[in-house]
Amino acid sequence: MFNDIGPLELVTLVVLAVLVFGPDKLPKMIQDVTRTIRKIREFSESAKQDIREELGPEFKDFEFEDLNPKTFIRKQLDNDELGLKEIRNGFDLKKEMAEVTDAVHGRESETSASSSSANGSAGGTVDMTKKREQLEADERPPFDADAT
C-alpha cells in the first residue's frame, strides 16, 4: 500500500499530521485510522470469502489478483510474448527512417539499391520528387489560394 511513498513524502505527511491534529490528538487519530483500515480489510476479506463460497469448489484456487488485466494477460500468455521480441528485434527504426528520408530526397538507399539490383528491371523505382517547371521571364508562378 505504501510502496510508492518515498521517505521525504512520509516525513512531510508526519509533519503535516502533527500540524493539523496537534501532538495531543495525534495518537488518538492514529488509532482511529488504523482501526478503520483494519475494518476495511476485514470487510474486503469477508467479501472475497463470500464470493469464493458462491463460486463453488471448482474455483477454490481462484485469485482476485488475476482480475487485474495485466496479470490476467501475463498468466494467459504464460509469460510468452507471442514472438514480440523477434518482431522488435527485426524492426530497425533507424534503417526504416533512413530509407524513407532517402526516398523523399530522391536518393537511393543501400538496401533499396541492393533489392532493386536483385530484382533486375522487373520493378522500376518510382521518382517521388517534384519536378519544377521552368518559367519564362515574364510568366508569373502559379498561385494556390489554399497554400497561403
Curated annotation (Swiss-Prot):
<dbReference type="InterPro" id="IPR003369">
    <property type="entry name" value="TatA/B/E"/>
</dbReference>
<feature type="compositionally biased region" description="Basic and acidic residues">
    <location>
        <begin position="100"/>
        <end position="110"/>
    </location>
</feature>
<feature type="transmembrane region" description="Helical">
    <location>
        <begin position="2"/>
        <end position="22"/>
    </location>
</feature>
<keyword id="KW-0813">Transport</keyword>
<dbReference type="GO" id="GO:0033281">
    <property type="term" value="C:TAT protein transport complex"/>
</dbReference>
<dbReference type="Pfam" id="PF02416">
    <property type="entry name" value="TatA_B_E"/>
</dbReference>
<protein>
    <recommendedName>
        <fullName>Sec-independent protein translocase protein TatB</fullName>
    </recommendedName>
</protein>
<keyword id="KW-0812">Transmembrane</keyword>
<feature type="compositionally biased region" description="Basic and acidic residues">
    <location>
        <begin position="128"/>
        <end position="148"/>
    </location>
</feature>
<keyword id="KW-1003">Cell membrane</keyword>
<keyword id="KW-1133">Transmembrane helix</keyword>
<keyword id="KW-0472">Membrane</keyword>
<dbReference type="GO" id="GO:0043953">
    <property type="term" value="P:protein transport by the Tat complex"/>
</dbReference>
<keyword id="KW-0811">Translocation</keyword>
<feature type="region of interest" description="Disordered">
    <location>
        <begin position="100"/>
        <end position="148"/>
    </location>
</feature>
<comment type="subunit">
    <text>The Tat system comprises two distinct complexes: a TatABC complex, containing multiple copies of TatA, TatB and TatC subunits, and a separate TatA complex, containing only TatA subunits. Substrates initially bind to the TatABC complex, which probably triggers association of the separate TatA complex to form the active translocon.</text>
</comment>
<dbReference type="GO" id="GO:0008320">
    <property type="term" value="F:protein transmembrane transporter activity"/>
</dbReference>
<dbReference type="InterPro" id="IPR018448">
    <property type="entry name" value="TatB"/>
</dbReference>
<comment type="similarity">
    <text>Belongs to the TatB family.</text>
</comment>
<keyword id="KW-0653">Protein transport</keyword>
<comment type="function">
    <text>Part of the twin-arginine translocation (Tat) system that transports large folded proteins containing a characteristic twin-arginine motif in their signal peptide across membranes. Together with TatC, TatB is part of a receptor directly interacting with Tat signal peptides. TatB may form an oligomeric binding site that transiently accommodates folded Tat precursor proteins before their translocation.</text>
</comment>
